[in-house]
C-alpha cells in the first residue's frame, strides 16, 4: 500500500485530528473509490495518535459509501488526538478519497 499520505511515523496511518466532543463514535465517508486494477479492498480504523493500535473496529471498503460510524472500544474525551489508519487486502490498485471525523 502506498503510504505517501502518512504524515507521521506510524505505519499506514496519518491524518491526525482531535475530538471536539465526548461521543465515542468516529465517522468515515468514502467519496471516491476508483479501481485501477485487480480487486483491492481497503480496511480502515481509528487509532490513538502516535500508534496504529485499533481504537475502533475496522471497516473494509470496496466502493464509495455514505458516512459509516465506527464505535470506539475505549473511553474518549474532547481534545484526545486520534489518527486514521488503513491497510489494503486483495491485489490491485485503487484511488480513494473521503473525509473522517474522530
Segments from the language model and where they lie:
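Post-signal peptide N-terminal regions of Sec-secreted extracellular proteins
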Residues: 1-102
Amino acid at each position: 500500500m502506498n503510504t505517501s499520505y502518512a504524515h507521521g511515523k506510524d505505519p499506514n496511518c496519518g491524518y491526525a485530528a482531535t475530538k471536539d466532543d465526548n461521543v465515542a463514535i468516529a465517522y468515515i465517508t468514502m467519496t471516491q473509490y476508483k479501481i485501477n486494477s485487480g480487486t483491492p479492498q481497503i480496511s480502515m480504523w481509528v487509532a490513538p495518535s502516535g500508534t496504529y493500535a485499533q481504537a475502533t473496529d475496522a471497516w473494509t471498503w470496496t466502493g464509495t459509501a455514505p458516512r459509516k460510524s465506527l464505535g470506539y472500544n475505549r473511553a474518549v474525551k474532547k481534545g484526545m488526538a486520534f489518527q486514521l489508519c488503513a491497510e489494503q487486502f486483495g491485489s490491485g490498485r485503487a484511488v480513494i478519497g473521503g473525509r473522517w471525523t474522530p
